[in-house]
């Protein structure tokens, strides 16, 4: 755990650990409760001070945090009756994208999300959250299934990008991403996408053509990583901090630009500090967003999605 603590979050992480220890003591002995309340107040104040001044690149690092909750962590906490569906019916099952059927507040839904691994073995299995074409084709199969049965689609975005390997290109990586974009654009059911970590390039957008897009407070969403941008523009990867600032990839920038619709506040110290609290906060925003579209029919949902994306961007000059 200590190896996963980022330098700028160390003071807060240490206090959070002390809060957990004192909370356990207070549960057994109420005399510790005043001390616990004081420590929680100090922790919250320090976290607000530190996290209010984070640079864009520091927020990118938080979005990649090894302990951050992934799609399956949210599925475990938000849904019941989860049944995972595997394979694209053409080539193989890609474990870097998970999807299936679930019940959400009594409503049947289709869930699709990027899935990273924890530890070397699982990261190899999940390909570090970088999907192959078969992953996107699995997602398409689920989108079309949702459309056929009139089920809302909830997606979770968390990838550095689509896998750039030779095999992936030979099997039609760009075509698969394009087909996923088209499939999302035409389904007549409500779609809510949530950026829960790192949202990189077309590999992320293939799960992001939604009626509404939520973003967690310390997530990012971009056409390219800051390191990649710096390497291309300036031939200097060390300028990633500058690139992160110019790319406007943090949650407040994304909201201002209209790329996302809602920012979901994270627990003190970030979502990785408390998965249960992070899921509870997301649940409130996700349910409110989904139910806000209850009165829209299939054609209205498609038109709403079309107008949302046509409205992005602006002409300058």
From Swiss-Prot:
It catalyses: N(6)-carboxybiotinyl-L-lysyl-[protein] + acetyl-CoA = N(6)-biotinyl-L-lysyl-[protein] + malonyl-CoA. Pathway: Lipid metabolism; malonyl-CoA biosynthesis; malonyl-CoA from acetyl-CoA: step 1/1. It comes from the Bacteria. Coiled coil: none annotated. GO terms for cellular component: acetyl-CoA carboxylase complex. Its EC number is 2.1.3.15. Keywords: ATP-binding, Cytoplasm, Fatty acid biosynthesis, Fatty acid metabolism, Lipid biosynthesis, Lipid metabolism, Nucleotide-binding, Transferase. It is found in: Cytoplasm. It is an enzyme of class 2 (transferase). GO terms for molecular function: acetyl-CoA carboxylase activity; ATP binding; carboxyl- or carbamoyltransferase activity. GO terms for biological process: fatty acid biosynthetic process; malonyl-CoA biosynthetic process. Acetyl-CoA carboxylase is a heterohexamer composed of biotin carboxyl carrier protein (AccB), biotin carboxylase (AccC) and two subunits each of ACCase subunit alpha (AccA) and ACCase subunit beta (AccD). Component of the acetyl coenzyme A carboxylase (ACC) complex. First, biotin carboxylase catalyzes the carboxylation of biotin on its carrier protein (BCCP) and then the CO(2) group is transferred by the carboxyltransferase to acetyl-CoA to form malonyl-CoA. Belongs to the AccA family. PANTHER family: ACETYL-COENZYME A CARBOXYLASE CARBOXYL TRANSFERASE SUBUNIT ALPHA, ACETYL-COENZYME A CARBOXYLASE CARBOXYL TRANSFERASE SUBUNIT ALPHA, CHLOROPLASTIC. This is Acetyl-coenzyme A carboxylase carboxyl transferase subunit alpha. It comes from Sorangium cellulosum (strain So ce56). The lineage of its organism: Bacteria, Pseudomonadati, Myxococcota, Polyangia, Polyangiales. The gene is accA.
């Amino acid at each position: 755990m200590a190896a996963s603590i980022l330098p700028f979050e160390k003071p807060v992480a240490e206090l959070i650990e002390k809060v957990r220890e004192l909370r356990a003591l207070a549960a057994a002995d109420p005399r510790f409760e005043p001390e616990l309340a004081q420590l929680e107040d100090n922790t919250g104040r320090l976290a607000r001070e530190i996290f209010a001044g984070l640079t864009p690149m520091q927020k990118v690092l938080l979005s990649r945090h090894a302990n951050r909750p992934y799609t399956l962590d949210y599925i475990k906490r938000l849904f019941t009756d989860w049944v995972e569906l595997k394979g694209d019916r053409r080539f193989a099952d890609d474990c870097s994208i998970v999807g299936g059927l679930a019940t959400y507040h009594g409503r049947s839904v289709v869930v699709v999300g990027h899935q990273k691994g924890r530890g070397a073995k699982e990261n190899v299995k999940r390909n570090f959250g970088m999907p192959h074409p078969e992953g996107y084709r699995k997602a398409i199969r689920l989108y079309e299934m949702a459309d056929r049965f009139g089920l809302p689609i909830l997606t979770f975005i968390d990838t550095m990008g689509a896998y750039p390997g030779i095999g992936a290109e030979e099997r039609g990586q760009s075509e698969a991403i394009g087909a996923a974009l088209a499939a999302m654009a035409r389904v007549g059911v409500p779609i809510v996408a949530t950026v829960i970590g790192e949202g990189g390039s077309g590999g992320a957008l293939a799960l992001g053509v939604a009626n509404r897009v939520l973003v967690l407070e310390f997530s990012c969403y971009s056409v390219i990583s800051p390191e990649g941008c710096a390497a291309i523009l300036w031939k200097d990867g060390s300028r990633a901090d500058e690139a992160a600032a110019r790319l406007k990839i943090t949650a407040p920038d994304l909201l201002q630009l209209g790329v996302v619709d809602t920012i979901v506040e994270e627990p003190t110290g970030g979502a990785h500090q408390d998965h249960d609290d992070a899921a509870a906060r997301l649940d409130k925003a996700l349910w409110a967003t989904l139910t806000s579209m209850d009165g829209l029919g299939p054609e209205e949902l498609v038109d709403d999605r079309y107008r949302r994306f046509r409205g992005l961007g602006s002409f300058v000059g």
